[in-house]
Regions:
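Signature aromatic-anchored transmembrane alpha helix within multi-pass, membrane-resident enzymes
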Residues: 569-606
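Membrane-interface transmembrane helices that cradle and orient dolichyl/undecaprenyl
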Residues: 140-149, 338-344, 379-396
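Short helix- or helix-capping micro-motifs
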Residues: 346-354, 403, 407
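Transmembrane-lumen/periplasm boundary regions of multi-pass, lipid-linked membrane glycan transferases
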Residues: 263-264, 271, 405, 416-545
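Membrane-embedded catalytic cores of phosphoryl/pyrophosphoryl-handling enzymes
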Residues: 107-226, 401
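Transmembrane-helix motifs of polytopic, lipid-linked glycan transferases
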Residues: 69, 137, 320-345, 378, ...
Length: 777
C-alpha cells in the first residue's frame, strides 16, 4: 500500500506543480467554481424543461432526486469515515491558484481584538472522495441515459472539473478517481432503482400513464400529432376514464406530499441549521405553560411542549410539527381542489406551494406562522362547505373552531372575520346563511376561544393589547412622507421575492383579472375574499408603519388558490404560453428554496461562501459555538469559588444560551442558569417570571451582549466576485461598549472581557461582548 500512496502523491505533485502555468492558473480555478455557474445552471435547467420534452423533465427530476442525496449522504458519509486530509492541509508547498492565502496547513483564525473565540466549525478538509468528481460523473451518467449524445460535452466537462481539483491542490488523484467511479455508480444505481419502482408502482397506481410510458428511460416512439397529457389540455373523455385520470393526479399529489414530509424531517435530523431566536425563546415558554404570553397566544408553547415531549429537548423536537403541518396543509389543499376544481390543478397548487420560499421555510421553522396558516386554511375550507346550498350547521361549527384555534395561534386571525364580512358583501347568494344560526354559532365558538387570552391579559394589566398597539404605532398620527412610499415599495419587493416573482405576479394578475372574466364563479369570489383583503390591509398599512413580510402568510394560500383556478381555466381555453411560465416559476422557486435551506451550496457552485451579513441562515447558525464561548467564561468565573450564572441582553440570546448550554437546558424550567437582564417595564415574557435579583444574591455572573453581524462595505459584491478574503468585505467589528448602568448598580464590580468573534466555517457570524460581574447585591 505504501507504493500506492507514493504514486498518488507523486502524480498529484506532477499535476499540481510540474504542469503549473499561467494559463492553467486562470482556467482551473474557474473550472472548479465561478460566479457564472449558477446562472448557467439555471438557464440549462430551464432549457432542459422547456425544450427537452418528457425526457428533459424526467432527466431534470432524476438529477434532483439522485445528485443531492448522493452528495449529502454517500460522499459526505465516506468523507467523514475516511477522514483523509486534503493535500493543502497535509503537504507543504502545495499550490492553490484558487486561494488568495498561502498554501500549507490551514491557518488558525485570528480575531481582530486578540481575544479568544468560541470553537468554530473548521472548513471541510476531508478529501476522499471528491464530491465535485462524483457529482459531475453522476450527472454525466444520468444525462447519457436520457440523451445519448450528451456525453460529447458532459464527459469532457466532468474530466475538466475533476482535473481542476488536482491542479488547485484540493484532492489527490485517488480522490478524484474514487469520486468519478462512485458518482457514475450511484447515478446508474439510482436510475435502476427508480426504473424498477416505476415498473411495479406505475402499473398498479398509475395504469393510464404507465400504458403510455412503461419505462422511465426507454420511450416508445410518439406518433405525430398525438398529444401528451402534460403538453395539451386533455380531450373530452368518458366519465370513468376522466375519474381514473383524476385519481392518478391525486395519488401523485399524495406521493409528493409524503416525499416532502420525509425530506423535511431528514433535513431537520441532519442538524444543518439550529434554532432561531424566536424558536428558542418560545421553547422556554413551553417550560412554563400558561393561558397566554406577553406577545403571542398559547398554542405555539403547547405545540413545542408536545414536540419536545415526543422527541426530547432537541432541534428536531422543537420543530417536529412544522413539517407535519406542511404535510397536512398540502393534503387539505389537494383534497379541496380534487373535489371543487380537479386533482391536476390541486397537484400543481401543491407543487407551486413547495416552490414558494416563504411557504417552504414555514415547513421547517416552528414559529407561530405555520399554526396560523394551518387554521386559517382549515377555516377557509370548512367555511366553503358551510356556505353551500342546503349545508347543515356542522360545517359552521367546525369553521368557528378553526377560527378560534387560529386566534390562539396568532392574533392576525381576527382579520379573517373581516374577510367574511367582505365575502357577504360581494356575494349576495351567501347572505341567506345570515338568516340561519350557523354563522352566529361559529362566532360564539370563536369568541369562547379568546377566553384564555382575555383571562391572562386581565391578570397582567392587558399587556398584550399595549404591546400590539405599540407595534402598530397606534398612538402615532399618520403623516405622508417619502419614507412611507419607500416602505410600500420595499414591502412589494420583498414579498415578490419570498412568494416567487413569477407566482407573485401571476397571483396579483389573477386577483384582478378574474373580476372581468369570472366574477360569477363563487369559488373565485370566496377564495379572493379569504386572502386578498388581508394582503391589501397590510399593503396599505406600510404607508403608516413598518410591516414584516411574514404577516401576510395566511393570505398566500387563498391567493394562490385563485391564481391556480384562474390560470387553469385559461390553459383549458388554449393559452399555451402558461407552460413556459410555470416551468420558469418552478425552476426558480426550487433553486431559491434549495439555497435557503443550505446556503453553503453557493460555495460549491462559485467557489466561495456568502458573506454572513447576507447569508439567509445566519440567524440559525453558530449559536452552539456562541454558547460554548459563554459557558467557558462562566466556568472560569465559577472556578473562583462562587456559583456563577449568565445574564443576556436580548430575549433571543437568552433563549439560545438556555437551549445550547447543557446545564441551562436541563434546569430551565425550575432553576434557570440564564436570565434576561433586569427591566423596569414589560418588554418580553421574562418580565413575568422570577429574575436573578433576589434569587442569586451574592453570586457572580457573566453578562452577554450580542453586537450582531458586521455590516458589509460599499462595493463588496465586486470584491466577493474577485475572491478577496471575507474579512475585507465587512466593516470592522464594532468597538467595545461600556457596561450598562444597571449592572454597575446590581453588582459590586463589573469587568469588561472584551469582544469575541463567533466563527462558522471560517466566517464571523456573530460578535458578542462579555462582562464579568461579581457579587450580586
Amino acid at each position: 500500500m505504501h507504493w500506492l500512496l507514493n504514486l498518488d502523491v507523486g502524480v498529484f505533485r506532477f499535476i499540481n506543480g510540474t504542469l503549473s502555468n499561467s494559463v492553467f492558473d486562470v482556467i482551473m480555478p474557474f473550472a472548479s467554481g465561478n460566479p457564472f455557474f449558477f446562472p448557467a445552471l439555471a438557464v440549462a435547467g430551464m432549457l432542459l424543461l422547456w425544450k427537452g420534452g418528457k425526457r428533459g423533465w424526467l432527466c431534470a427530476v432524476m438529477l434532483a432526486l439522485i445528485l443531492w442525496p448522493g452528495d449529502s449522504f454517500i460522499c459526505n458519509t465516506i468523507k467523514h469515515a475516511v477522514a483523509r486530509p486534503r493535500p493543502f492541509v497535509a503537504l507543504t508547498d502545495v499550490r492553490q491558484p484558487a486561494a488568495k492565502h498561502p498554501s500549507g496547513p490551514a491557518p488558525r483564525m485570528e480575531h481582530p481584538q486578540g481575544n479568544p473565540a468560541a470553537p468554530a466549525s473548521e472548513p471541510n478538509h476531508n478529501s476522499m472522495p471528491s464530491s465535485h468528481a462524483a457529482n459531475w460523473f453522476a450527472a454525466t451518467m444520468i444525462c447519457y441515459v436520457f440523451f445519448r449524445r450528451s456525453w460529447k460535452f458532459m464527459l469532457p466537462l466532468a474530466c475538466l472539473v475533476s482535473f481542476s481539483r488536482l491542479y488547485n491542490g484540493m484532492h489527490y488523484p485517488s480522490d478524484v478517481l474514487a469520486g468519478a467511479i462512485l458518482g457514475a455508480g450511484y447515478g446508474a444505481a439510482g436510475l435502476w432503482a427508480f426504473e424498477s419502482l416505476w415498473r411495479v408502482a406505475g402499473r398498479k397506481w398509475f395504469p393510464l400513464w404507465w400504458e403510455k410510458f412503461p419505462s422511465l428511460v426507454n420511450f416508445p416512439p410518439q406518433p405525430a400529432g398525438d398529444p401528451d397529457f402534460e403538453d395539451e389540455a386533455p380531450p373530452p373523455l368518458e366519465e370513468t376514464r376522466h375519474a381514473s385520470l383524476d385519481a392518478h393526479w391525486l395519488r401523485l399529489g399524495y406521493i409528493f406530499i409524503a416525499v416532502c414530509l420525509c425530506a423535511n424531517l431528514v433535513y431537520l435530523l441532519s442538524g444543518l441549521i439550529g434554532l432561531s431566536d424566536d424558536e428558542a425563546y418560545q421553547w422556554i415558554w413551553s417550560k412554563h405553560l400558561a393561558l397566554s404570553y406577553y406577545s403571542k397566544p398559547l398554542l405555539i408553547a403547547y405545540t413545542q411542549w408536545l414536540g419536545t415531549h415526543l422527541w426530547g429537548d432537541t432541534v428536531f423536537g422543537v420543530r417536529f410539527f412544522s413539517p407535519v403541518i406542511g404535510a397536512i396543509l398540502g393534503f387539505l389543499l389537494l383534497r379541496f381542489f380534487a373535489r371543487e376544481v380537479n386533482a391536476r390543478a390541486g397537484f400543481f397548487l401543491v407543487l407551486i406551494v413547495s416552490a414558494t420560499p416563504l411557504l417552504a421555510l414555514g415547513s421547517v421553522l416552528m414559529t407561530i406562522d405555520p399554526l396560523s396558516v394551518l387554521f386559517w386554511t382549515a377555516a377557509m375550507i370548512s367555511g366553503w362547505r358551510a356556505i353551500q346550498p342546503g349545508a347543515k350547521t356542522g360545517p359552521w361549527l367546525w369553521t368557528g373552531l378553526w377560527l378560534g384555534l387560529g386566534f390562539l395561534s396568532k392574533y392576525t386571525e381576527l382579520l379573517q372575520l373581516v374577510c367574511w364580512v367582505v365575502f357577504f358583501i360581494l356575494w349576495k347568494p351567501a347572505r341567506v346563511h345570515l338568516r340561519k344560526p350557523g354563522p352566529y354559532l361559529a362566532l360564539v365558538i370563536n369568541l369562547l376561544c379568546t377566553a384564555p387570552v382575555l383571562i391572562w391579559n386581565r391578570q397582567h394589566g392587558w399587556i398584550t393589547v399595549i404591546h400590539v398597539a405599540s407595534n402598530a404605532s397606534a398612538n402615532r398620527p399618520w403623516e405622508p412622507s417619502w419614507s412611507h412610499l419607500a416602505d410600500f415599495a420595499s414591502f412589494l419587493g420583498v414579498e415578490s421575492f419570498l412568494l416567487n416573482p413569477i407566482f407573485f405576479i401571476a397571483a396579483i394578475w389573477a386577483g384582478i383579472a378574474f373580476w372581468r372574466r369570472a366574477r360569477h364563479d363563487p369559488r373565485l369570489v370566496y377564495l379572493f375574499c379569504m386572502g386578498s383583503p388581508l394582503f391589501l390591509i397590510y399593503l396599505l398599512f406600510t404607508l403608516h408603519s413598518r410591516v414584516l413580510p411574514n404577516w401576510i402568510a395566511p393570505a398566500v394560500l387563498p391567493m394562490f388558490c385563485v391564481m391556480v383556478i384562474y390560470w387553469d381555466t385559461r390553459w383549458r381555453l388554449g393559452v399555451r404560453s402558461l407552460k413556459s411560465w410555470l416551468v420558469a416559476g418552478l425552476a426558480i422557486g426550487f433553486l431559491v428554496v434549495g439555497f435557503m435551506h443550505e446556503s453553503s451550496l453557493v460555495q460549491h457552485i462559485v467557489g466561495r461562501p456568502l458573506p454572513p451579513k447576507i447569508d439567509p441562515l445566519t440567524r440559525v447558525r453558530a449559536y452552539p459555538a456562541l454558547a460554548r464561548t459563554v459557558e467557558e467564561a462562566r466556568e472560569k468565573l465559577e472556578a473562583e469559588g462562587k456559583p456563577a450564572f449568565i445574564i443576556a441582553g436580548h430575549y433571543g440570546t437568552t433563549g439560545q444560551l438556555s437551549f445550547y448550554i447543557p446545564e441551562a437546558r436541563a434546569t430551565v424550567a425550575d432553576h434557570p442558569l440564564v436570565y434576561f437582564q433586569t427591566t423596569t417595564n414589560a418588554i418580553n415574557q421574562f418580565y413575568f417570571w422570577p429574575g436573578y435579583v433576589g434569587n442569586r444574591t451574592g453570586q457572580n455572573a457573566i453578562y452577554v451582549k450580542e453586537l450582531g453581524t458586521p455590516p458589509l462595505v460599499k462595493g463588496w459584491i465586486t470584491s466577493w466576485l474577485e475572491g478577496k478574503p471575507m474579512e475585507s468585505l465587512a466593516r470592522p467589528v464594532p468597538a467595545a461598549k461600556a457596561p450598562p448602568a444597571f449592572l454597575l448598580q446590581e453588582f459590586d464590580s463589573v469587568k469588561d472581557l472584551g469582544l469575541y468573534n463567533i466563527y462558522y466555517r471560517g466566517r464571523i457570524f456573530h460578535t458578542i461582548q462579555m462582562f464579568e460581574c461579581r457579587n450580586l447585591h
